[in-house]
């Protein structure tokens, strides 16, 4: 493996969907990046109809794949307003709300910085700047570095 890229959902709060962040040190000459994106699991990976959020991660992965020599018939189109799109509350919606009823309101917040080469996508900071109500606890330790 010469390249390894991992898109992570910053706003997924189901502990059962905790990301498998890569923590093993990378070998020499292997490019690794794990990037956090706005949204819950299916917002980042795709799964909701008419949702612009998955295109953020897909465009990033396409860019990385193209840089590694892969070709594409078309580029992913990312709307400038995509980072401000609705984030689905997968915690409350999952299993028609049964998940939240069973687990209670014990939302899980991801931990940033324990993995190999973790980065935060610019779309997260765009949303942070535009939406004063968007302050993921996961980023509390790194947000001051970004401003």
What do these predicted ranges mean?
Residues 1-147:
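Active-site- or binding-pocket-proximal scaffold segments within functional domains
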């Amino acid at each position: 493996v010469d390249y390894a890229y991992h898109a992570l959902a910053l706003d997924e709060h189901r502990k059962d969907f905790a990301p498998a962040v890569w923590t093993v040190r990378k070998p020499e000459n292997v490019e690794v990046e794990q990037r956090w994106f706005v949204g819950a699991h299916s917002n980042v990976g795709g799964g909701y109809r008419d949702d612009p959020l998955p295109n953020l991660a897909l465009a990033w992965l396409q860019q990385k794949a193209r840089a590694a020599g892969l070709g594409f018939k078309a580029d992913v189109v990312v709307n400038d307003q995509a980072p401000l799109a609705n984030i689905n509350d997968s915690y409350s919606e999952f299993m028609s709300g049964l998940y939240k009823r069973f687990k209670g309101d014990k939302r899980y917040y991801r931990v940033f910085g324990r993995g190999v080469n973790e980065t935060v996508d610019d779309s997260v900071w765009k949303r942070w700047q535009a939406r004063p109500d968007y302050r993921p606890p996961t980023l509390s330790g790194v947000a001051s570095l970004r401003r």
